[in-house]
Amino acid sequence: MSAEIICVGTELLLGDILNSNSQFLAKELARLGIPHYYQTVVGDNPSRLKQVIEIASNRASILIFTGGLGPTPDDLTTETIADFFNTPLVERPEIIEDMSRKFAARGRTMTDNNRKQALLPQGADILPNPLGTAPGLLWQPRPNLTLMTFPGVPSEMKRMWQETAIPYLKNQGWGKEIIFSRMLRFRGIGESALAAKVSQFFDLTNPTVAPYASLGEVRLRVSAKTRSEQEAIALIDPVAQELQKIAGLDYYGSDDETLASVVGSVLRQKGETVSVAESCTAGGLGSVLTSVAGSSDYFRGGIIAYDNSVKVDLLGVNSADLEQYGAVSDIVAQQMALGVKQRLGTDWGVSITGVAGPGGGTDTKPVGLVYVGLADSQGKVESFECRFGTERDREMVRSLSAYTALDHLRRKLLVR
């Protein structure tokens, strides 16, 4: 007994539209504890869609379709489904009435081609669309097979899923067990290194632990399958706490917590402020810090010191040091951090200077070399050398630089 997602639309195959519907539905199925092993994207082609239905209907009990429900000629999902199951389409007057009301409320005239949206296979139930004009269907064309169709518009699909599909599935006995997960987030450690530290947890069966990696960050998803969220939390908590203990400072937060929100919380708790001086990131660090609502409580501002003259005039960087060591150096990073801290009167000053590329690198200072400077309220100033590699593009280096600088600040805040 499993579900399968079928997303219909040539625009998805061409990459013109991000397929966020499949991501949403996959998460929802996991949350409901409904097994889900396959997803398919197929273009607006009846014969290929029939092939997909043939395969999916022989391996899944619930087929969930998105897309292809509109009034245009390429909207073929409903009629293809009906044709596959040799069932006639029947016009539903209640759908016509609903569409007429919606068009009138919007001050528009309903054209004849919209009547196509009122055609459903004989015996199918209407899956109401509160937001749009294209309803879906809820149908059991044969025993042990349920079909649900949704528009491709994400807002409409989500509303229909939440208001109609979920209650139906639960009423049918699906979703008696839920899968509840907590995502633990780590920085400053690679996926393989973290996996080696916590490898014994990968053999657990309930909860399970699975690693994921993204740019500059590693995550561990701890998931439990139980009858209630409370039971799941009771299983997850001790495992999550042990993982955090093993990781130490490499662990920074969980679920929706971001590095910026965690740093902001610590600064707010301590009643401290921070300012930034940026060169190669050109405001990237300030942007990350201010992505958190209420960041004005602790973020005073920043100086983008891209040109060396700005480093000297606004941050007080020694011109002789610039000449001797270059802008990309530990001593300049330290002076930038101290300079912005003093200039803006904050407890902490953070600086970034480096070679983002693709040009500008040398044998001694290659693309990807970045220095992060930190100055604290106790007068201590230090810097950290980061080498992100010559193979990474400019935006990756800039992003890694901003988040690495923020993570250095987090660690210093926690140990001071």
Swiss-Prot record:
Disulfide bonds, paired cysteine numbers: none
SMART domains: MoCF_biosynth
Listed SUPFAM superfamilies: CinA-like, Molybdenum cofactor biosynthesis proteins
Pfam family, one: MoCF_biosynth
Gene3D superfamilies named in the record: 3.30.70.2860, CinA-like, MoaB/Mog-like domain
InterPro entries: CinA, CinA-like_C, CinA_C, CinA_KH, Competence-induced_CinA, MoaB/Mog-like_dom_sf, MoaB/Mog_dom
Family: Belongs to the CinA family.
Protein name per UniProt: CinA-like protein
